[in-house]
């Protein structure tokens, strides 16, 4: 044997698993098809949000959370309704217990810290029923100080220490194409060696094959990510209930997120479940400085902007920004569209627009307290201003008529009627001016401002978009942005990959997005956010510890 365990994928889940294996004294080889510059995978590019339950940060903000409430929110959002959801549901229960228990202390011991204001993602808005409902009842999205790189740092440090002492070996440009088996058990991997590449992180690397390889091991952990960079696979798995898959989508993940290892593991006997469950965003914008193919960025908007379909009609309640990502996506694509509009004024944008991603938040990523405090002075952040100035999806005009004209020019259509758009904005402004209002979005926004975190940093003071200040109006074309795979390799609570007969595939484990973040789909149909990095941490830790025990 070349190693005790082979880990396929040098993203967050793979690094966590490898670090746990090394701590247990196991010899590990990590294989990844990308160059060394891309170590950390998708997690590097992330905003660094983590879900905690009843955290010190929540309590300081007078947010009352509990494991029982979090699990009710999770199950209401997941909507588990299939026989295949047996293991995903158990993983969900375990994850909520982890998020309410040792998760924060475990990460804090490794040096991780969090921004003091907890964000409120996926607010739901469908009301409460006996069967539950989607959304976070309270804010739970904790921003890691350092964003995605800050989440990676402790595990990269542990892995590099193990590399230095000879416990772990990192082999980049190694693409696994098969799991090696003997007498029904997996005994390692085989694959192709790719040509060296010095492209920067995230840039598409060459797929030129220069050789082949084989690595023998007692166990293999598949931590290779999902399918978000492979639009062909996304369309193949697109559920009919969402309408036809869009002909045009943009990518929220690099090209290497291709889903290839799911097929490799299936061919060896592993079972993929819930492949039609995915988590794509309807608020994607084209990056003015793209790194990968069709590079898109997600807008993290507060709830005040009007959300319109391509014909200028408002999305129905509660499909407001930040309330129900899947509901909004399904409404848009179900009507045959592949884009929508956010309409607001510049004052609202300055407070309510943030951008997802480590590179779009250099103050938080760089741990620059002075820059973070500078956000309170008002005005858009530097990255948001860059999109206002250079973003191909932004239309900024002084009047409604000119805004409508610009929207039509951008799309090459005449779908937006200026008079109808003016009436819509005026009707919204009347509701805001009343001080109370009956419009569901105005009411929901006022309710959200009761939370001090939103009132201080996230939601602008209610005001008319068409007022005497002369503030310009903004329309943003939002594309469908591919991102996460919610289904994946079915695993038991020890992260062992299961066969179609429900028995473990000997010697194979899976973690992270490749395993649907646990069990083959821990989120069900919908996520609460802050749970993808967390799912990689949780499942990677379990896989590493379980494999270490199995090869002892």
Regions found by a protein language model. Give the residues of each.
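Beta1/beta-strand and adjacent pyrophosphate-binding region of the FAD-binding site
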Residues: 1-13, 29
